[in-house]
Amino acid sequence: MNRKVIVVIPAAGLGTRMSPVVRGESPRGGKKPRASKQFTDLAGTPILIRTLRIFAGVPEVGEIYVSLRKDEIAGFRARLEKEGKEILKKKVELVEGGEHRQQSVANALAAVSADKDDIVLVHDAVRPFVTPEIINEVIDAAGKHGAAIAGVPAIDTVKQVERTAEGALISSTIPRERVVMAQTPQGFRYEVIRKIFDEAAADGFMGTDEASLAERSGYKVSVVMGSPRNIKITTPADLQLAEFYLKSA
């Protein structure tokens, strides 16, 4: 099938949990501290650029849209031209993000021109260890089912709790075989992602991820196997683990 694959990377967050260890050059230029976790250096390269390189290396991917804070767009474009020439072999658009992830994705979708059966992947800016194999499996599952995510089985026992005046009390144990830990990319046929975002906006609904919007709109979301290494780098401990992964690769 001759379908286009579009990648959306929401990267407008501040990442306050990472701020104690943020290092590297600001996308706005200079060395002043900032808390944008996606620009944190990982072995000398910003996490966001590492993530973009993975998607740029997947032949099926045709276009990449990155949502950024308005004051970071010009600086990041300059960094891409300097450090990401292989990324720019794809069509790359930098768009202004929103206050929340969902708005950042919506802003990127507003800039996209696609047919109903094209595939849109949404991926966390700070998951630089995603593999081409995972990406392609999500593409295929999204094309078949309309909506798909990468996920990994839960390892720890999961408890459901009730909040009471006495504190959090366990109400039940959720069987682990019924639980997956959601990752990205999360993929959708274009007609599906447009519909779920339009419905969420009309109702003022804010979801925790794109799959939650699809669930709310009545879609069954397929799950493909992700990887324990496909971590989201949001804390100093995550950054240390990422550095270990690079050294052990």
Regions found by a protein language model. Name each.
Residues 61, 117, 144-147, 219, ...:
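Short, high-confidence coil segments that cap the C-terminus of an alpha-helix
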Residues 129-224:
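Conserved core of the sugar-phosphate nucleotidyltransferase
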Residues 124:
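Substrate/cofactor-recognition hotspot
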Residues 49-117, 201:
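Conserved N-terminal catalytic core of the sugar/cofactor nucleotidyltransferase
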